Amino acid sequence: MSNSLGKLFQITSFGESHGDCVGVVIDGVPAGLAINVDEIQVEVDKRKSRAKAHATPRCEDDRIEIFSGILNNFTTGAPICLVIWNKNIDSSEYERTRSKIRPGHADFTGFVKYGGFNDFRGGGRFSGRITAGHVMAGAIARKLISTIGIEVIGYTAELGGIVAKLPKTKDIRQNISQSDVNCPDLTATKKMLALIQQAAEEGDSLGGVVECLGLNLPVGLGEPVFDTLEGELAKAMFAIPAVKGVEFGAGFEASRLRGSKNNDPFSIQANHIRTTSNKCGGVLGGISDGMPLQFRVAVKPTPSISLSQPTVNIDTMTNTSLEIRGRHDTCIVPRAVSVVEAMTCIVLADLALRAGMIPRVIKQ
């Protein structure tokens, strides 16, 4: 398995869905960064469901424990180890259906890849549960990039085909705080919640789109040709279970435009070179151009549904059917927002360190 991401700001994820714990080790964090457990806990708590309609019945406390790397609320420069203990575990449903591979999950590929020795309970290493570690690391990264003024905002842009109308950037964060699905369009929020409730009653699930903005990025983040800003972000996004697509700026829409319509004209704005539009999503040649970073992440419907689905009994090699009765979300899109934000912060922290924009010791 490959469980590490990043070069200078490097995270190593560990744990399984129904194991003792999930966690992360973070290497390369500069010494002297002011951070306390409450700041990390705030980010982890954002990952929890706010509305019963789309919430998993598995309610974990998710209290963070700091094992190393932080002393008296400052980073020491040593590896930071953060852990969350799994306490609310029920593996009975997975034991009952162990021989039946779940459609849409990694049961089949994981079984073949690891010879049947992989932890199948709750999806094991393939579960969204492991993203709790990503979010803890993202909290450290968020604090680090804030020292050079970078801010990251994510939100639900689409859910079950309902598309949000986006307000001005300055209003997005306030509106998100009032939405149970992390959507800045409060009218769309009501429709999304109703649709989630309907899907839950039908035993089905929903997907959607998370949009993410990176504000105040300096020009120069990204290491062409193989560690571009887009490339590193895309790799990080695809490490999130359920992500099936990523597009930057105009994305696939750009393929339908002429160059005269797709190009972002340059101009001088407040003594800085900027563009008058942002179809490139803040990235040119794999390098940040000083405009807002903007990209979208497609999240598939939760594959665990209670409807009967055709599948295979991997022990007897016969066709069969499966009805999943476990504890699952109807829609994970609202919860994925915090994970997308976290992974974005991690990538930006790594690239900022590689570009020499953040010192190895943070002086207050």
Swiss-Prot record:
Pathway membership: Metabolic intermediate biosynthesis; chorismate biosynthesis; chorismate from D-erythrose 4-phosphate and phosphoenolpyruvate: step 7/7
Catalytically driven reaction(s): 5-O-(1-carboxyvinyl)-3-phosphoshikimate = chorismate + phosphate
GO molecular function: chorismate synthase activity; FMN binding
Cited PROSITE patterns: CHORISMATE_SYNTHASE_1, CHORISMATE_SYNTHASE_2
Biological process terms in GO annotation: amino acid biosynthetic process; aromatic amino acid family biosynthetic process; chorismate biosynthetic process
Enzyme Commission no: 4.2.3.5
GO-annotated cellular components: cytosol
Broad class of enzyme this protein falls into: lyase
Binding-site residues for FMN, renumbered to this chain: R125, F126, S127, G285, K300, P301, T302, P303, S304, R327
Cofactor binding notes: Reduced FMN (FMNH(2)).
Binding sites annotated in the UniProt record for NADP(+): R47
Necessary cofactors: FMNH2
InterPro entries membership: Chorismate_synth, Chorismate_synth_AroC_sf, Chorismate_synthase_CS
CDD domains xrefs: Chorismate_synthase (cd07304)
Protein keywords: Amino-acid biosynthesis, Aromatic amino acid biosynthesis, FAD, Flavoprotein, FMN, Lyase, NADP
Database matches in PANTHER family: CHORISMATE SYNTHASE
Purpose of the protein: This reaction introduces a second double bond into the aromatic ring system.
HAMAP family hit by this protein: Chorismate_synth (MF_00300)
Family: Belongs to the chorismate synthase family.
Subunit structure: Homotetramer.
Listed name of the protein: Chorismate synthase
UniProt source species: Dehalococcoides mccartyi (strain ATCC BAA-2266 / KCTC 15142 / 195) (Dehalococcoides ethenogenes (strain 195))
